[in-house]
């Protein structure tokens, strides 16, 4: 069966890897829609290669510019409405959500309402509104297929298993770019230092989140919703080699793990062709060459953002959306070298502390909390500077 795919975020790290997968298996995958933010040069190349029916960019000006460069019949849209138009296009049956941040929330919700299966790589959508997204998927008979390597690993480990027999999920973490630094050394580190991820090729925002371990915190929150498992049964383990992508421990003491080379094309391909597998030419795992694997507990005093994520997830309501929004603001300013590395965790903590939580929130309440948190975090950092 051919999968007709729309990719939200086609010019990013996940999006370009996904298009590599499509190129490797043109008999199985066809592109219906693509979206980019500002990188219209790369999007132009993608349009010429994959001939999508519809694309979307950030602004009307970019859309107008793109129209002058494209001679195909591809429809060109823009903004949030454009994202939603791509996500809900009637010709697609699978949507890869790989845009960065909470901007993926509305198009994902609309895609589910349009009864599309979602290959989900945008973890912030589940962090901010996991209860809404998972319920919509159930109501509309849609599958949420994880793309993050850790969640894909758990998804594969649970294939054919009974969720009631799970004792715990163990999410692995590389530890990020600063894993071997002390708190004292981390004080003066800049964005260029954090962007040197030891194992994975990722976008800038995600690489900074990896350095703070906030990314791992978001993955814990995502796992809670994807697999309907309480936070008390989700552990994080530092595994510097990034060979074991995650593990599941069952009530009888058995542990199932998923291993593979650190290449995002593998979980993307698995999500695209689920429930069956396709052959690939990607690097095969050779444990004899690797020789040994190492594991350790995360240091929550050194990386408090992971602890914040657990605490905010357990509180629930609008607090996770506030956590995410404050992180997005601080992360972006750190990337511009406008704040110090530790200002990220301080901003998140102060913003969450100031928030008045709303339990069982509507989508509007979540979006309102998101906007409040962005404004509050910005004000904190303006006062600091």
From Swiss-Prot:
Keywords: Isoprene biosynthesis, Manganese, Metal-binding, NADP, Oxidoreductase. The keyword NADP applies. GO terms for molecular function: 1-deoxy-D-xylulose-5-phosphate reductoisomerase activity; manganese ion binding; NADPH binding. Its cofactor is Mg(2+); Mn(2+). It comes from the Bacteria. GO terms for biological process: isopentenyl diphosphate biosynthetic process, methylerythritol 4-phosphate pathway involved in terpenoid biosynthetic process. InterPro entries: DXP_reductoisomerase, DXP_reductoisomerase_C, DXP_reductoisomerase_N, DXPR_C, DXPR_C_sf, NAD(P)-bd_dom_sf. It holds the Pfam family DXPR_C. It catalyses: 2-C-methyl-D-erythritol 4-phosphate + NADP(+) = 1-deoxy-D-xylulose 5-phosphate + NADPH + H(+). 1-deoxy-D-xylulose 5-phosphate binds at residues 123, 149-150, 174, 197, 210, 215-216, 219. The keyword Lipid biosynthesis does not apply. Its EC number is 1.1.1.267. NADPH binds at residues 11-14, 39, 122, 124, 203. Pathway: Isoprenoid biosynthesis; isopentenyl diphosphate biosynthesis via DXP pathway; isopentenyl diphosphate from 1-deoxy-D-xylulose 5-phosphate: step 1/6. Belongs to the DXR family. This is 1-deoxy-D-xylulose 5-phosphate reductoisomerase 1.
């Amino acid at each position: 069966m051919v999968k007709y795919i729309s990719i939200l975020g086609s010019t990013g790290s996940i999006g370009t890897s996904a298009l590599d997968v499509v190129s490797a298996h043109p008999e199985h995958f066809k592109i219906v829609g693509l979206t980019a933010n500002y990188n219209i040069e790369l999007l132009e190349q993608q349009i010429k290669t994959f001939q999508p029916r519809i694309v979307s960019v950030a602004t009307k000006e970019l859309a107008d510019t793109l129209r002058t460069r494209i001679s195909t019949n591809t429809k060109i849209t823009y903004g949030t409405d454009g994202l939603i138009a791509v996500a809900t296009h009637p010709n697609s049956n699978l949507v890869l959500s790989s845009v960065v941040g909470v901007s993926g929330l509305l198009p994902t919700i609309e895609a589910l309402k349009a009864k599309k299966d979602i290959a989900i790589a945008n973890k912030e959508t589940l962090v901010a509104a996991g209860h809404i997204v998972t319920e919509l998927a159930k109501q509309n008979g849609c599958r949420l297929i994880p793309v993050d390597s850790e969640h894909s690993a758990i998804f594969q480990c649970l294939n054919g298993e009974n969720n009631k027999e799970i004792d715990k999920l163990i999410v692995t973490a590389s530890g990020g770019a600063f894993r071997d630094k002390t708190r004292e050394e981390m004080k003066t580190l800049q964005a260029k230092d954090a962007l040197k991820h030891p194992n994975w090729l990722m976008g800038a925002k995600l690489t900074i989140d990896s350095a703070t371990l906030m990314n791992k915190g978001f993955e814990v929150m995502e796992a809670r919703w994807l697999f309907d498992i309480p936070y008390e049964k989700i552990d994080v383990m530092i595994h510097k080699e990034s060979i074991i992508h995650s593990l599941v421990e069952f009530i009888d003491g058995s542990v199932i793990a998923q291993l593979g080379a650190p290449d995002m094309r593998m979980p993307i391909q698995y999500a695209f062709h689920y429930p069956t597998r396709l052959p690939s030419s990607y690097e095969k795992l050779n444990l004899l060459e690797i020789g040994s694997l190492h594991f350790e507990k995360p240091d929550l005093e050194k990386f408090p953002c992971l602890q914040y994520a657990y605490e905010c997830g357990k509180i629930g309501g609008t607090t996770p959306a506030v956590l995410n929004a404050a992180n997005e603001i601080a992360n972006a300013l750190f990337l511009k070298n406008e704040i110090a590395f530790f200002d990220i965790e301080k901003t998140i903590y102060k913003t969450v502390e100031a928030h008045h939580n709303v339990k069982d929130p509507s989508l509007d309440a979540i979006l309102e909390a998101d906007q409040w948190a962005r404004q509050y975090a910005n004000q904190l950092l303006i006062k600091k500077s």
